[in-house]
Amino acid sequence: MKALHFGAGNIGRGFIGKLLADAGIELTFADVNQTVLDALNARHSYQVHVVGENEQVDTVSGVNAVSSIGDEVVDLIAEVDLVTTAVGPVVLERIAPAIAKGLAKRKAQGSERPLNIIACENMVRGTTQLKGHVFNALAEEDKAWVEAHIGFVDSAVDRIVPPSASATHDPLEVTVETFSEWIVDKTQFKGALPTIPGMELTDNLMAFVERKLFTLNTGHAITAYLGKLAGHQTIRDAILDEKIRAVVQGAMEESGAVLIKRYAFDPQKHAAYIQKILGRFENPYLKDDVERVGRQPLRKLSAGDRLIKPLLGTLEYGLPHRNLVKGIAAAMHFRSEDDPQAQELAALIADKGPQAALAQISGLDAASDVVAEAVNDYNAEK
């Protein structure tokens, strides 16, 4: 089996690429970073530091790399069995034209072999969004063939992969936590279902997507935003602050009440899942910076993302949301010189005031009680 993975960054190498290579799949990375491409093609291997209760170093071998712009990547799409991505939500649109060209070439070659494409991004139904971008780039006469032969498979991914603080300055070395979860929608595959250790198949993906979004992502973001406000450097420092921990755990319990109502999750199992995630935030081996985790606050405050979506669930079911609102107020305070979205957020609040700004970003009604509550919390932190 052959696979092409877009994105040779830390998540690509440390998570999805590692699982594919470990499964004995012939793997090629596609990226724009020439330093990483050259290193991969010189060595065809790299090291992954897996940190947690037991620290180990795994070697991933037998990998190749190509530029994600150019003919080579198009040729590969025409011949592989699986395409995966870990490029970040905003980059999906940029790689879509190359995928469209590769699919058109595949059709022109008369290939009948199914190909499945899985976007492994920190977003809801990322592959469905990628499919939209690909179809925008396809010629009209190719669309029916692609619909029949190409599976666009949505997934939920979960593994904390902080930027590597490699002492060796090796561009390929990566550190990951022990925990990992890759859940894919088995109803969307074309052809036989693959057997890849570490890939879990489900016919109820949205339950897992929202479980991860409402727990890991919600908790991670609120830890970062409250941590930044309190002057903490890392997620671990922040979650060990009892005041912050109480709000974060409270927010995850509030979002969890939505999940229990919506998907009939077992309350005790979900409480254990929350505790496991709090333990992951405490991992002393992960030097995860609050500024990195908090970046792109406009996206994280949008209606379908980790802060507002669980809040909307609490409003839908008439459930408490006090801690979620505190997290939203903290997100509105996020400032970073290195993040254009943080600067845009600050400018929007300065221009329109917190009430109108939050309503515009989140889609919440500016006159609603919940926006008033968030604005009160925001002003209390000034």
UniProtKB/Swiss-Prot annotation:
- Catalyzed reactions: D-mannitol 1-phosphate + NAD(+) = beta-D-fructose 6-phosphate + NADH + H(+)
GO MF terms listed in the record are: mannitol-1-phosphate 5-dehydrogenase activity
Q: Name a single GO cellular component.
A: cytosol
User: Which UniProt keywords are given for this protein, alphabetically ordered?
Assistant: NAD, Oxidoreductase
GO biological process: any one?
mannitol catabolic process
List of residues binding NAD(+): 3-14
Keyword hit for Membrane: no
Its Enzyme Commission number(s) read 1.1.1.17
Record carries keyword NAD: yes
InterPro entries, per this entry?
6-PGluconate_DH-like_C_sf, 6PGD_dom2, Mannitol_1_phos_5_DH, Mannitol_DH, Mannitol_DH_C, Mannitol_DH_CS, Mannitol_DH_N, NAD(P)-bd_dom_sf
Family matches, as NCBIfam families: PRK02318.1-2, PRK02318.1-3, PRK02318.1-4, PRK02318.2-2, PRK02318.2-5
What family does the entry list? Belongs to the mannitol dehydrogenase family.
| Protein name, as recorded | Mannitol-1-phosphate 5-dehydrogenase
Q: Lineage of the native species?
A: Bacteria, Pseudomonadati, Pseudomonadota, Gammaproteobacteria, Enterobacterales
Gene this protein is translated from: mtlD
